[in-house]
Regions:
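The feature marks long extracellular or luminal low-complexity segments
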Residues: 2-5, 18-294
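Bacterial N-terminal signal peptides
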Residues: 7-16
Protein backbone atom coordinates (compact mmCIF):
# COMPACT_ATOMS: atom_id res chain seq x y z
CA UNK A 1 0.00 0.00 0.00
CA UNK A 2 2.84 2.34 0.89
CA UNK A 3 4.40 1.75 -2.47
CA UNK A 4 1.15 2.59 -4.21
CA UNK A 5 0.77 5.81 -2.22
CA UNK A 6 4.41 6.74 -2.88
CA UNK A 7 3.94 6.10 -6.58
CA UNK A 8 0.81 8.25 -6.65
CA UNK A 9 2.57 11.08 -4.82
CA UNK A 10 5.48 10.90 -7.25
CA UNK A 11 3.11 11.10 -10.19
CA UNK A 12 1.29 14.03 -8.59
CA UNK A 13 4.53 15.91 -7.97
CA UNK A 14 5.69 15.34 -11.55
CA UNK A 15 2.31 16.42 -12.90
CA UNK A 16 2.37 19.57 -10.77
CA UNK A 17 5.92 20.40 -11.84
CA UNK A 18 4.95 19.92 -15.46
CA UNK A 19 1.90 22.11 -14.96
CA UNK A 20 3.97 24.77 -13.23
CA UNK A 21 6.56 24.74 -16.00
CA UNK A 22 3.91 25.15 -18.68
CA UNK A 23 2.08 27.71 -16.57
CA UNK A 24 5.12 30.03 -16.32
CA UNK A 25 4.29 31.83 -19.55
CA UNK A 26 4.65 35.55 -20.23
CA UNK A 27 3.88 38.02 -22.99
CA UNK A 28 5.55 41.29 -23.90
CA UNK A 29 5.51 43.75 -26.82
CA UNK A 30 7.69 42.93 -29.80
CA UNK A 31 8.99 46.51 -29.82
CA UNK A 32 9.02 49.37 -27.33
CA UNK A 33 10.45 52.90 -27.33
CA UNK A 34 13.63 53.70 -25.44
CA UNK A 35 12.96 55.19 -22.02
CA UNK A 36 9.26 54.26 -21.97
CA UNK A 37 7.70 52.07 -19.28
CA UNK A 38 5.75 48.99 -20.32
CA UNK A 39 4.20 45.89 -18.74
CA UNK A 40 4.84 42.17 -19.09
CA UNK A 41 1.89 39.85 -18.44
CA UNK A 42 2.43 36.42 -16.85
CA UNK A 43 0.30 33.34 -16.25
CA UNK A 44 0.48 30.58 -13.66
CA UNK A 45 1.09 30.78 -9.93
CA UNK A 46 4.03 30.97 -7.61
CA UNK A 47 7.18 33.02 -7.58
CA UNK A 48 9.64 33.62 -10.36
CA UNK A 49 12.40 35.86 -11.62
CA UNK A 50 12.41 37.89 -14.83
CA UNK A 51 15.81 38.84 -16.22
CA UNK A 52 16.23 41.44 -18.98
CA UNK A 53 19.49 41.27 -20.94
CA UNK A 54 20.10 44.41 -23.00
CA UNK A 55 22.93 46.07 -24.99
CA UNK A 56 24.19 48.07 -22.00
CA UNK A 57 22.93 46.36 -18.84
CA UNK A 58 21.13 43.42 -17.23
CA UNK A 59 18.20 43.90 -14.85
CA UNK A 60 16.50 41.38 -12.53
CA UNK A 61 12.89 41.45 -11.29
CA UNK A 62 11.16 39.23 -8.73
CA UNK A 63 7.65 38.37 -9.91
CA UNK A 64 4.43 36.76 -8.78
CA UNK A 65 3.20 34.59 -11.60
CA UNK A 66 -0.21 35.69 -12.80
CA UNK A 67 0.53 39.34 -12.06
CA UNK A 68 1.73 41.97 -14.51
CA UNK A 69 5.36 43.04 -14.31
CA UNK A 70 6.12 46.75 -14.69
CA UNK A 71 9.35 47.47 -16.55
CA UNK A 72 10.73 50.91 -15.69
CA UNK A 73 12.13 53.40 -18.18
CA UNK A 74 15.63 52.95 -16.75
CA UNK A 75 15.70 49.30 -17.82
CA UNK A 76 15.15 50.05 -21.53
CA UNK A 77 17.06 53.26 -22.29
CA UNK A 78 19.48 51.63 -24.72
CA UNK A 79 18.13 50.83 -28.17
CA UNK A 80 18.71 47.37 -29.59
CA UNK A 81 17.81 43.71 -29.12
CA UNK A 82 16.81 42.46 -25.66
CA UNK A 83 16.34 38.96 -24.26
CA UNK A 84 13.74 38.44 -21.51
CA UNK A 85 14.13 35.25 -19.44
CA UNK A 86 11.45 34.10 -16.98
CA UNK A 87 12.68 31.57 -14.44
CA UNK A 88 10.05 29.71 -12.38
CA UNK A 89 9.62 26.19 -10.99
CA UNK A 90 13.10 25.20 -12.05
CA UNK A 91 12.30 25.95 -15.69
CA UNK A 92 13.16 28.89 -17.94
CA UNK A 93 11.28 30.55 -20.75
CA UNK A 94 12.85 33.23 -22.93
CA UNK A 95 11.67 35.72 -25.53
CA UNK A 96 13.25 38.55 -27.49
CA UNK A 97 12.04 42.08 -28.14
CA UNK A 98 13.46 45.26 -29.56
CA UNK A 99 13.85 48.76 -28.16
CA UNK A 100 13.74 51.53 -30.78
CA UNK A 101 15.27 54.98 -30.33
CA UNK A 102 12.98 57.75 -29.13
CA UNK A 103 12.25 61.01 -30.89
CA UNK A 104 15.19 63.16 -32.05
CA UNK A 105 16.59 65.21 -29.19
CA UNK A 106 20.23 66.02 -29.86
CA UNK A 107 22.80 65.85 -32.61
CA UNK A 108 26.51 65.72 -33.31
CA UNK A 109 27.67 68.03 -36.08
CA UNK A 110 30.91 68.04 -38.06
CA UNK A 111 31.86 70.80 -40.52
CA UNK A 112 34.83 70.81 -42.90
CA UNK A 113 37.03 72.57 -43.76
CA UNK A 114 37.63 75.26 -41.15
CA UNK A 115 38.85 77.77 -43.74
CA UNK A 116 37.43 78.36 -47.23
CA UNK A 117 37.62 80.99 -49.98
CA UNK A 118 34.60 83.26 -50.30
CA UNK A 119 32.14 82.96 -53.15
CA UNK A 120 32.83 79.31 -54.03
CA UNK A 121 30.29 76.58 -54.75
CA UNK A 122 29.99 73.41 -52.65
CA UNK A 123 33.17 74.06 -50.66
CA UNK A 124 31.68 73.61 -47.17
CA UNK A 125 30.61 70.14 -46.04
CA UNK A 126 28.46 69.36 -43.03
CA UNK A 127 27.31 66.04 -41.57
CA UNK A 128 24.96 65.59 -38.62
CA UNK A 129 24.22 62.47 -36.56
CA UNK A 130 20.82 62.48 -34.84
CA UNK A 131 20.31 60.94 -31.38
CA UNK A 132 17.49 60.68 -28.86
CA UNK A 133 17.85 61.91 -25.28
CA UNK A 134 19.51 58.62 -24.27
CA UNK A 135 22.21 58.84 -26.98
CA UNK A 136 20.63 56.25 -29.26
CA UNK A 137 21.10 56.87 -32.98
CA UNK A 138 17.66 57.65 -34.42
CA UNK A 139 17.36 55.47 -37.51
CA UNK A 140 13.88 56.69 -38.43
CA UNK A 141 13.88 59.57 -40.96
CA UNK A 142 13.99 63.01 -39.34
CA UNK A 143 14.68 66.53 -40.55
CA UNK A 144 17.89 68.45 -39.93
CA UNK A 145 18.16 72.13 -40.83
CA UNK A 146 21.48 73.60 -41.97
CA UNK A 147 22.06 77.38 -41.92
CA UNK A 148 25.10 79.38 -42.98
CA UNK A 149 25.46 83.07 -42.14
CA UNK A 150 28.18 85.72 -42.08
CA UNK A 151 27.95 88.86 -40.00
CA UNK A 152 24.41 88.01 -38.96
CA UNK A 153 23.21 87.81 -42.57
CA UNK A 154 22.01 84.40 -43.72
CA UNK A 155 23.64 83.31 -46.96
CA UNK A 156 22.26 79.76 -47.28
CA UNK A 157 19.68 77.50 -45.63
CA UNK A 158 18.34 74.03 -46.38
CA UNK A 159 16.55 71.11 -44.74
CA UNK A 160 17.84 67.57 -45.17
CA UNK A 161 16.09 64.31 -44.24
CA UNK A 162 18.28 61.82 -42.43
CA UNK A 163 19.05 58.37 -43.74
CA UNK A 164 19.95 55.80 -41.08
CA UNK A 165 20.39 58.65 -38.61
CA UNK A 166 22.72 60.75 -40.77
CA UNK A 167 22.13 64.01 -42.67
CA UNK A 168 24.76 65.40 -45.02
CA UNK A 169 25.02 68.53 -47.13
CA UNK A 170 27.34 70.80 -49.10
CA UNK A 171 27.03 74.56 -48.93
CA UNK A 172 28.35 77.45 -51.00
CA UNK A 173 30.56 79.88 -49.15
CA UNK A 174 29.22 83.41 -48.76
CA UNK A 175 30.37 86.29 -50.91
CA UNK A 176 31.98 88.19 -48.04
CA UNK A 177 34.95 87.21 -45.94
CA UNK A 178 34.69 86.71 -42.20
CA UNK A 179 33.72 84.11 -39.60
CA UNK A 180 30.77 82.17 -41.04
CA UNK A 181 28.36 80.56 -38.57
CA UNK A 182 27.45 77.06 -39.80
CA UNK A 183 24.52 75.77 -37.72
CA UNK A 184 22.77 72.39 -37.68
CA UNK A 185 19.50 72.10 -35.74
CA UNK A 186 16.56 69.79 -35.10
CA UNK A 187 13.29 71.66 -35.73
CA UNK A 188 10.98 71.35 -32.73
CA UNK A 189 13.57 69.88 -30.36
CA UNK A 190 14.15 71.85 -27.15
CA UNK A 191 17.33 70.23 -25.82
CA UNK A 192 20.39 72.49 -25.73
CA UNK A 193 22.22 69.90 -27.80
CA UNK A 194 19.57 70.08 -30.54
CA UNK A 195 21.40 73.05 -32.07
CA UNK A 196 25.13 72.88 -32.77
CA UNK A 197 27.22 75.74 -34.15
CA UNK A 198 30.51 75.54 -36.01
CA UNK A 199 32.69 78.41 -37.27
CA UNK A 200 34.08 78.34 -40.81
CA UNK A 201 36.49 81.14 -41.64
CA UNK A 202 35.75 82.62 -45.06
CA UNK A 203 38.71 84.37 -46.63
CA UNK A 204 39.22 86.22 -49.89
CA UNK A 205 39.49 84.00 -52.95
CA UNK A 206 42.13 84.41 -55.64
CA UNK A 207 42.73 87.82 -57.16
CA UNK A 208 40.33 89.03 -59.83
CA UNK A 209 40.95 91.68 -62.53
CA UNK A 210 44.54 92.09 -61.38
CA UNK A 211 45.99 95.30 -62.82
CA UNK A 212 49.18 97.30 -62.34
CA UNK A 213 50.82 100.52 -63.44
CA UNK A 214 54.50 101.30 -64.00
CA UNK A 215 56.64 104.41 -63.77
CA UNK A 216 60.23 104.98 -64.83
CA UNK A 217 62.59 106.68 -62.37
CA UNK A 218 66.27 107.48 -62.59
CA UNK A 219 67.28 104.17 -60.96
CA UNK A 220 64.46 101.67 -61.66
CA UNK A 221 61.06 100.94 -63.04
CA UNK A 222 58.57 101.19 -60.18
CA UNK A 223 55.52 98.92 -60.53
CA UNK A 224 52.43 99.07 -58.37
CA UNK A 225 49.13 97.20 -58.43
CA UNK A 226 45.70 98.66 -58.14
CA UNK A 227 43.90 97.49 -54.95
CA UNK A 228 43.95 93.69 -55.19
CA UNK A 229 40.55 92.10 -54.57
CA UNK A 230 38.74 88.89 -55.40
CA UNK A 231 35.75 88.71 -57.72
CA UNK A 232 33.37 89.40 -54.81
CA UNK A 233 35.20 92.58 -53.85
CA UNK A 234 37.02 91.18 -50.82
CA UNK A 235 40.52 92.49 -50.23
CA UNK A 236 43.24 89.87 -50.36
CA UNK A 237 45.02 89.59 -47.00
CA UNK A 238 48.26 91.41 -46.29
CA UNK A 239 51.23 89.20 -47.05
CA UNK A 240 49.76 87.64 -50.19
CA UNK A 241 52.49 87.29 -52.82
CA UNK A 242 52.27 89.18 -56.11
CA UNK A 243 54.91 88.43 -58.75
CA UNK A 244 56.20 91.06 -61.18
CA UNK A 245 58.16 89.85 -64.21
CA UNK A 246 60.26 91.93 -66.62
CA UNK A 247 61.49 90.49 -69.93
CA UNK A 248 63.92 92.38 -72.17
CA UNK A 249 66.97 91.71 -74.33
CA UNK A 250 69.08 91.12 -71.21
CA UNK A 251 66.84 88.31 -69.99
CA UNK A 252 64.16 87.88 -67.35
CA UNK A 253 63.88 89.59 -63.96
CA UNK A 254 61.33 88.51 -61.36
CA UNK A 255 60.38 90.18 -58.08
CA UNK A 256 57.95 88.82 -55.49
CA UNK A 257 56.20 91.50 -53.48
CA UNK A 258 53.77 91.17 -50.59
CA UNK A 259 50.44 92.93 -50.53
CA UNK A 260 50.23 95.64 -47.91
CA UNK A 261 46.97 97.51 -47.45
CA UNK A 262 45.57 96.07 -50.70
CA UNK A 263 48.54 97.11 -52.85
CA UNK A 264 51.80 95.43 -53.90
CA UNK A 265 54.83 97.48 -54.98
CA UNK A 266 58.21 96.56 -56.43
CA UNK A 267 61.20 97.94 -58.34
CA UNK A 268 62.46 96.35 -61.57
CA UNK A 269 65.74 97.03 -63.40
CA UNK A 270 65.81 99.89 -65.89
CA UNK A 271 65.35 98.83 -69.51
CA UNK A 272 64.92 100.58 -72.83
CA UNK A 273 62.47 97.99 -74.13
CA UNK A 274 60.79 95.63 -71.67
CA UNK A 275 57.56 93.68 -71.30
CA UNK A 276 56.31 93.69 -67.72
CA UNK A 277 53.63 91.31 -66.43
CA UNK A 278 51.98 90.71 -63.05
CA UNK A 279 50.50 87.58 -61.46
CA UNK A 280 49.15 86.35 -58.16
CA UNK A 281 49.11 82.58 -57.83
CA UNK A 282 47.55 81.25 -61.02
CA UNK A 283 45.88 84.57 -61.86
CA UNK A 284 47.53 86.70 -64.54
CA UNK A 285 47.10 90.45 -64.69
CA UNK A 286 47.72 93.00 -67.40
CA UNK A 287 50.98 93.41 -69.33
CA UNK A 288 52.82 96.67 -69.95
CA UNK A 289 55.50 97.55 -72.52
CA UNK A 290 58.13 100.03 -71.39
CA UNK A 291 60.29 101.79 -73.97
CA UNK A 292 63.11 104.23 -73.58
CA UNK A 293 60.84 107.17 -74.08
CA UNK A 294 58.24 106.12 -71.55
Amino acid sequence: MRRVILALLTIAVCWFASYAAHAAEFNLPKQVTAGKEFSVTTSGSGDGVLVLIGPRAISRHKVKLGDAISISDEDVRAAGRYIAVLRAGGESNSKTFFVAAGKPGKLTFLARPSRVPAGKQDVISGVAFVFDQYDNLVLAPSEVKFDLSVGGKQSASRAVTTKNGIAWTRMNSGSTQGAAQFVASLPGAEDEEATVRRVVQQVAAEACNLRMKAQRTERAIVVETEPVKDCSGNSLPDGTIVTFTEVDSAGRSTVDARIKRDIARAELPLSDNAAISVASGVVLGNELHMGSGK
